Amino acid sequence: MLSNHLQNGIESDNLLWSRVPESDDTSTDDITLLNSHRDGDGGVNSLDYEVIENYAYREEQAHRGKLYVGYYVAVKWFFSLLIGIGTGLAAVFINLSVENFAGWKFALTFAIIQKSYFAGFIVYLLINLVLVFSSAYIITQFAPAAAGSGIPEIKGYLNGIDIPGTLLFRTLIGKIFGSIGSVGGGLALGKEGPLVHTGACIASLLGQGGSTKYHLNSRWPQLFKSDRDRRDLVTCGCAAGVAAAFRAPVGGVLFALEEVTSWWRSQLMWRVFFTSAIVAVVVRTAMGWCKSGICGHFGGGGFIIWDVSDGQDDYYFKELLPMAVIGVIGGLLGALFNQLTLYMTSWRRNSLHKKGNRVKIIEACIISCITSAISFGLPLLRKCSPCPESVPDSGIECPRPPGMYGNYVNFFCKTDNEYNDLATIFFNTQDDAIRNLFSAKTMREFSAQSLLTFLAMFYTLAVVTFGTAVPAGQFVPGIMIGSTYGRLVGMFVVRFYKKLNIEEGTYALLGAASFLGGSMRMTVSLCVIMVEITNNLKLLPLIMLVLLISKAVGDAFNEGLYEVQARLKGIPLLESRPKYHMRQMIAKEACQSQKVISLPRVIRVADVASILGSNKHNGFPVIDHTRSGETLVIGLVLRSHLLVLLQSKVDFQHSPLPCDPSARNIRHSFSEFAKPVSSKGLCIEDIHLTSDDLEMYIDLAPFLNPSPYVVPEDMSLTKVYNLFRQLGLRHLFVVPRPSRVIGLITRKDLLIEENGESSAVELQQSTSVRGRYSETATRMDAARPLLDDLLG
């Protein structure tokens, strides 16, 4: 019992430690989300990843048999299957739409410029403008939470932050159709980050049975009522999004593990890997189906996979220095990109976007016009180059036939045997432009002047575009930027080491990895993704080298891109390491400014309503008194649970005396206390109480958490931070140092051996643990090994 741990009573000024210890707000875990998309009251709350083991929960668990446990496990795996299928189909739809819009746009433009370049430019600009306008209109008018990549918001959700609107059905729709418009409209952004958000939305909607607002819900799948279960599903959705975007199932698993999740369990690894595998099957099936030509312009190049298996087979020791230089350049440009996007986004939010949705739409349209003018106009200023003699041997046609786009684009050239190298990059889809930069056997296809021009202009466009009111990812733009300066370095190496068999495309690949490492600061997952999308395992050591260097250089200047954006949006992430100044602080110092409101075990309904209406605390310590008058803390009750009790009224009683929870018939199931994702949940204004109701009482003992986590007041704040984050807590009690110890648990008290070979260890175990295990072992027979592996 918690009361045995708190013999000396409590001090109301240092009882709770919440997610933001430096907050001056009296609300311990209600944090205002500044300058963000608001839905409802505009704030964010912490999620309850800790299982509230109250009497209602324990009674429900006691009545669950093997059949229910098997059903529970089966539904988890079935939902993992549905998440993989749903995310894969969403990715196919997005890519099919983007490729066809881009194909029709370029085909029409190339057809018109055969007669008039000005008319072709007008058509090209108008098509891009319509697509971008549709994307911005959908976001501003229908789904404001779908703007941006969505990864900082999902990372915050998996870190324990409930951000309104992030996982709604309309956010999913806005993300899908908004991505089609923004990417198809030629903006300097990608669809990979939005696909991660899309997978998370699909997972969340499946976990709650659909959307109640749009009457697209069902009761039978509403099994996962706890935030802990929903967190696992959203993790599967994030991995599925990466797997669908890059056709990299292993990379998707590692991305979820390295970048977005804060808590990871071995059982979750099974389902995440299974979900990513399902995505890979769905995507490859769709790709094979589209090879027959029924998908229009969408074919083999629809998903961003760039096969460089025919590139450079080996490397020389002399090449390590220029490769290290690529890593340094990636770290510098990545850190600069993060800082510039921070300034641009901050200015945009504080000045421009405050003027309303119309300004957001106009801004996106202006950027679309500028991007179209640059991508069409700059190649006109570049002189065409004659086709190289080695092109026929490589199997690549030079120039491309009219109406085609790819390598060696004939754009504003005087003769048919010429190509425009700047148009080959600019006047193309991003996927095909990257494929051109990565391509082997295309020595000297691009001039240094064209690559420098493209690098400067596209880098600027990527900075300016990031933060507009459209869905935007930074994976592909980052690959574009990195592959450009990587190919530049490769050109220098080719000219410096004339006799070596060096491919410029290999250096372009290393440059892409270096920029992503310098901007996003991912290592393991990004390394695997780059290997999977390029189908070249031989380059793995080189990719690892440039990633390590670029990350180290970038970390010397600022945080990663997603951390910077999360901080800008006011998402209170708990990072893996506490801040340095916490080493000099203790737990008591972190919560001295807080005003903690305690509730008695049996409380008047009027007092509960008054307390809930006068503050926004989400957790309340519940106290009781011994016969000698000593104050004891008996647990923690959540605000959401109190609201459910007030609304139902079935637990009201006339007597102010406590009842025996074990002998009481609990009239609530544990799932009734869960807050749905797609709605704001209950608030005190939604509850109507009569004057007779207000005079009645509630015994809180059956509904409180009798065993919350507790730390002494003089524990170091770094230790408190690690405990709070690793356990996924929402509240943590800070109490005076207890005066009495009732026991000491060691490793041997928690070990239970099931075979006779380890009897020596078993004899050392706690008698109570072994006795309890012997009572339950007969009930957990043959089904247990399977359930232990699958349940979680």
From Swiss-Prot:
Annotated tissue distribution: Broadly expressed in the plant, but predominantly in the silique.
Every CBS domain range: 592-652, 704-761
Swiss-Prot/TrEMBL GO biological process terms: negative regulation of innate immune response; unidimensional cell growth
Phenotypic consequence of L187R: Abolishes the activity
InterPro entries: CBS_dom (IPR000644), CBS_dom_sf (IPR046342), Cl-channel/antiporter (IPR051280), Cl-channel_core (IPR014743), Cl_channel_pln (IPR002251), ClC (IPR001807)
A Pfam cross-reference name: CBS
Annotated TM spans: 78-98, 119-139, 170-190, 195-215, 237-257, 267-287, 320-340, 361-381, 451-471, 474-494, 508-528, 529-549, 731-751
Effect annotated for changing I180R: Abolishes the activity
GO molecular function: voltage-gated chloride channel activity
Topology relative to the membrane: Multi-pass membrane protein
Keywords, sorted A to Z: CBS domain, Chloride, Chloride channel, Ion channel, Ion transport, Membrane, Repeat, Transmembrane, Transmembrane helix, Transport, Voltage-gated channel
PROSITE patterns in the cross-refs: CBS
Stored Gene3D superfamilies: CBS-domain, Clc chloride channel
Chain's role: Voltage-gated chloride channel.
Subunit structure: Homodimer.
Family, similarity comment: Belongs to the chloride channel (TC 2.A.49) family.
Protein name as it appears in the record: Chloride channel protein CLC-d
Biological source species: Arabidopsis thaliana
Gene: CLC-D
